[in-house]
């Protein structure tokens, strides 16, 4: 890690910090996503019922009234307010996260992954505490935005993912990296399914604070694990200032430093492909709960929890599908198959007016998440071992930008098209997915130059 130290000569390494055990990073991702999925649909439903109460709208809708397709102007205003406040939270998180993710991710290349994991865990913990205050004390909704901003300042879930994926890249070989990344994403899915079922039962009586208390307990355990049990994967660590432009420069240099053209071209185009994938995934996720709450579906908390669990299931089925398909297909063609099923699922959502059709759409997404671990593994092979943190912090930035675009497009488009075609945002999502499909096909055709397949594992 030459050039990282503050003084010339051989860098001064930090002494190895004693930990209770040398735990892997997967439990952190599992616990973090468990807490987030537990809170996500609950926050949307809380906003819905909070605005319903403020506007005098009867939120307890019956099945027979849901079959009536006439538009209630008050219900439409509730949907619009819920969608817009979701947008405000995501925009606030992005604007702060754009600065903090790049700073903290590149910093972790020097000081190790643990400090970033601890900071991100504390940020998620703080956000949950503020959410509890809002629900318990009936505070202004703006405090939810404040919690989102404070969480982003400390790294947020995207920073935790950046450190986690970089940690996997630190210890995995080029051959096993794709499946290790998929395994990490599978932890996200299993945690999401479990949290969805538990969240549905906790919300039976619409006591919104209960899931937040459980999330607080989970995040407390996660923070302690990150601080005392995680086994550091960066072997040579050097004391480095946090607030310095060097960290941002190291991220920019990944894309602009003079290097063999093909390597940097692939870096940029794969980043674009994963940007579109995340935009579609997060955009659809943002409006699905709202789509299911309103007519003609009118799902209750139990059905929403089942739908949220089905939304997480592709993390697990994609891991199994990837493992099986790798025996007979190259990674790129596995990704193309996943994109086809993703497109089909979005098209079914667009025209779903009954519950069985919605679950058919969820079923078609069973291979939809093979794409992102494949792209992450390909990107990881394009940079040096000492640049893994910078790379995944750049991807965290891409994730934040995708979240902003997803919120801006889908949360604005959804209320705007309620009177025309309610499922139009899902049709747009299906169309956008052709972009990564085309990009990956082009890059695969041009991907046979051996010198860019793998850097040495040692710096």
Swiss-Prot record:
It is found in: Cell membrane; Apical cell membrane; Basolateral cell membrane; Endosome membrane. It catalyses: folate(in) + H(+)(in) = folate(out) + H(+)(out); (6S)-5-methyl-5,6,7,8-tetrahydrofolate(in) + H(+)(in) = (6S)-5-methyl-5,6,7,8-tetrahydrofolate(out) + H(+)(out); methotrexate(in) + H(+)(in) = methotrexate(out) + H(+)(out); pemetrexed(in) + H(+)(in) = pemetrexed(out) + H(+)(out). One of its GO terms (cellular component) is apical plasma membrane. Residues 1-25, 109-112, 155-177, 228-266, 326-331, 377-388, 442-459 are cytoplasmic. The modification N-acetylmethionine is found at residue 1. H(+) binds at residues 156, 185, 281. Glycans are attached at residues 58, 68. One of its GO terms (biological process) is tetrahydrofolate biosynthetic process. The modification Phosphoserine is found at residue 458. The chain crosses the membrane at residues 26-44, 83-108, 113-135, 141-154, 178-203, 209-227, 267-289, 303-325, 332-351, 356-376, 389-414, 423-441. Expressed in retina and retinal pigment epithelium. PROSITE patterns: MFS. Disulfide bonds join 66-298. GO terms for molecular function: folic acid binding; folic acid transmembrane transporter activity; folic acid:proton symporter activity; heme transmembrane transporter activity; methotrexate transmembrane transporter activity; symporter activity; transmembrane transporter activity. It holds the Pfam family MFS_1. Proton-coupled folate symporter that mediates folate absorption using an H(+) gradient as a driving force. Involved in the intestinal absorption of folates at the brush-border membrane of the proximal jejunum, and the transport from blood to cerebrospinal fluid across the choroid plexus. Functions at acidic pH via alternate outward- and inward-open conformation states. Protonation of residues in the outward open state primes the protein for transport. Belongs to the major facilitator superfamily. SLC46A family. This is Proton-coupled folate transporter. It comes from Bos taurus (Bovine).
């Amino acid at each position: 890690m030459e050039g990282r130290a503050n003084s010339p000569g051989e860098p001064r390494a930090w002494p190895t910090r004693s930990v209770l055990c040398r735990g892997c990073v997967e439990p952190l991702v599992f616990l973090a996503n468990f807490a987030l999925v537990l809170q996500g649909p609950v926050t949307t439903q809380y906003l819905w019922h909070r605005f319903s109460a403020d506007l005098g709208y009867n939120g307890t809708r019956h099945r027979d009234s849901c079959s009536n397709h006439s538009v209630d102007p008050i219900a439409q205003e509730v949907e619009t307010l819920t969608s817009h406040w979701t947008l405000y939270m995501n925009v606030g998180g992005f604007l702060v996260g754009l600065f903090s993710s790049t700073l903290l991710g590149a910093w972790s290349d020097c000081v190790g992954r643990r400090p970033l994991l601890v900071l991100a865990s504390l940020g998620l913990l703080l956000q949950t505490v503020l959410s509890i205050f809002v629900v318990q004390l009936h505070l202004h909704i703006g405090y939810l935005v404040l919690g989102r901003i404070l969480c982003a300042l400390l790294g947020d879930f995207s920073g935790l993912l950046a450190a986690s994926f970089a940690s996997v890249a630190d210890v995995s070989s080029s051959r096993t990296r794709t499946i290790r990344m998929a395994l990490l994403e599978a932890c996200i899915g299993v945690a999401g399914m479990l949290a969805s079922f538990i969240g549905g039962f906790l919300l039976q009586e619409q006591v919104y604070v209960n899931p937040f208390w459980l999330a607080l307990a989970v995040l407390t355990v996660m923070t302690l694990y990150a601080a005392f049990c995680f086994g550091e994967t960066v072997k040579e660590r050097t004391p480095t200032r946090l607030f310095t432009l060097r960290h941002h420069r190291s991220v920019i240099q990944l894309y602009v430093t003079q290097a063999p053209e093909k390597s940097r071209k692939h870096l940029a185009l794969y980043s674009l492909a994963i940007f579109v994938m995340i935009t579609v995934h997060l955009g659809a996720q943002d409006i699905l709960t709202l789509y299911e709450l309103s007519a003609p579906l009118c799902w209750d908390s139990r059905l929403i929890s089942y739908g949220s669990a089905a939304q997480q299931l592709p993390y697990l089925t994609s891991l199994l599908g990837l493992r099986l398909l790798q025996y007979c297909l190259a990674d790129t063609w596995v990704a193309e198959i996943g994109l086809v099923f993703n497109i089909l699922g979005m098209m079914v959502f667009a025209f779903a007016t009954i519950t069985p059709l919605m679950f058919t759409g969820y079923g078609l997404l069973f291979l939809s998440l093979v794409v992102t671990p494949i792209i992450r593994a390909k990107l990881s092979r394009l940079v040096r071992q000492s640049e893994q943190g910078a790379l995944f912090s750049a991807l965290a930035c891409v994730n934040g930008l995708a979240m902003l675009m997803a919120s801006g497009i889908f949360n604005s488009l959804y209320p705007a098209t309620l009177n025309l075609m309610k499922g139009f945002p899902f049709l747009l999502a299906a169309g956008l997915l052709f972009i990564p499909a085309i990009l990956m096909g082009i890059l695969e055709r041009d991907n046979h130059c051996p010198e860019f397949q793998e850097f040495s594992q040692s710096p």
